[in-house]
């Protein structure tokens, strides 16, 4: 019985191995669809809890930069997220995030540090890369 259990565990670990875009090995235990749904659900909850910015100009600015980044995602990764959505949250937090399922959150406080579109693009590109590299799936 113990050998069967160990064999099953070894098979599971081999089946769950994946490689990130950087070539690093990953242990992926959940399907991309499951993790994407968790990201979508979390984002919906966050939108209910956090104040969303009403500044249309800044929202368009963030959306424009995010669109430019998403447009450059290689075709081989575009299948993992079909629709990216950006929300600008009205908060002094100097932060941004991206969740599985293609949801990007940016806090207005980020503009204290990101003074131009190149700096914003660096932050958003970093966050999008987390999604493409399936980092959330590794953490589950």
Each predicted region: which residue ranges?
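C-terminal motif of bacterial Sec signal peptides marking the signal peptidase cleavage site
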Residues: 13-16
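Bacterial N-terminal signal peptides that target proteins for export
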Residues: 1-8
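Polar low-complexity intrinsically disordered regions enriched in Ser/Thr and small residues
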Residues: 10-11, 26
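Short, isolated positions within intrinsically disordered regulatory regions of eukaryotic proteins
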Residues: 8-9, 88
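Peri-catalytic and regulatory segments of divalent metal-dependent proteins
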Residues: 18-140
